[in-house]
A protein has these predicted regions:
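N-terminal amphipathic/basic leader segments beginning at the initiator methionine
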Residues: 1-42
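Anionic-ligand anchoring segments at beta-strand to alpha-helix junctions in alpha/beta enzyme folds, i.e.
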Residues: 14-22, 60-102
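Short helix/loop capping segments that flank catalytic or ligand/cofactor-binding pockets
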Residues: 25, 37-39, 55-58, 90, ...
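Active-site cavity-forming subdomains of large catalytic enzyme subunits
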Residues: 29, 97-165
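N-terminal glycine-rich anion-binding loops that anchor highly charged ligand groups
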Residues: 36-46, 75-83
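Short glycine-rich or small-residue beta-strand-to-loop segments that form or flank ligand, phosphate
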Residues: 44-58, 86-93, 117-124, 131-132
């Protein structure tokens, strides 16, 4: 994880400023059971999770999100998991394409409205992955995703942008 001065983190506006609003944010996070040492001066890493029992592409994300959180903690960050709409092609009618832009807007607004310094995107289907990236790209935050999207013969790795046969 790249080290930044705490005051250079985007999340500093939520937790580090000495004003009434930031006092409220710090109070709420303490009410959730976190101590100051858990989050103070650490980058807040959002984990946008499209887990759903009805989406066969995403059924394993519940466990994976916990593993991602452990990795963020180990790297010196403060993880915040946020749920997002899960697009399941076999069950959504008439098509998940109608909902792709909703997920993109939801992703952008989650990142805009919460104190995220970076984000891990958890999506794995042909509409979900582009939607997550469409929404996150507008924020200018560090983004990572470890999922392959694509058909049987070709796949696209979002974190590298390379095609593989």
């Amino acid at each position: 994880m790249i080290k930044k001065r705490p005051e250079d983190l985007r999340s500093h506006k939520w937790f580090g400023v000495d004003d009434l609003r930031s006092f409220g944010h710090r109070s709420r996070i303490k009410q959730m059971g976190y101590s100051r040492e858990d989050w103070a001066g650490k980058p807040v890493i959002g984990i946008i999770n499209t887990w759903s029992e009805i989406n066969s592409c995403h059924t394993h994300f519940r466990q994976r999100a916990e593993e991602v959180k452990r990795g963020v903690w180990q790297a010196g960050g403060f993880p915040i998991e946020m749920p997002a709409i899960s697009l399941a092609e076999p069950f959504q009618k008439p098509s998940t394409m109608m909902y792709r832009n909703i997920l993109a807007m939801e992703t952008e607004e989650l990142l805009r409205s919460y104190p995220c310094d970076g984000v891990v995107l958890m999506g794995g289907c042909d509409k979900t992955t582009p939607a997550l990236f469409m929404g996150a790209a507008s924020m200018g935050l560090p983004i990572t995703s470890q999922h392959r999207a694509g058909g049987q013969k070709y796949s696209w790795q979002p974190h590298t942008g390379r095609s593989h046969k």
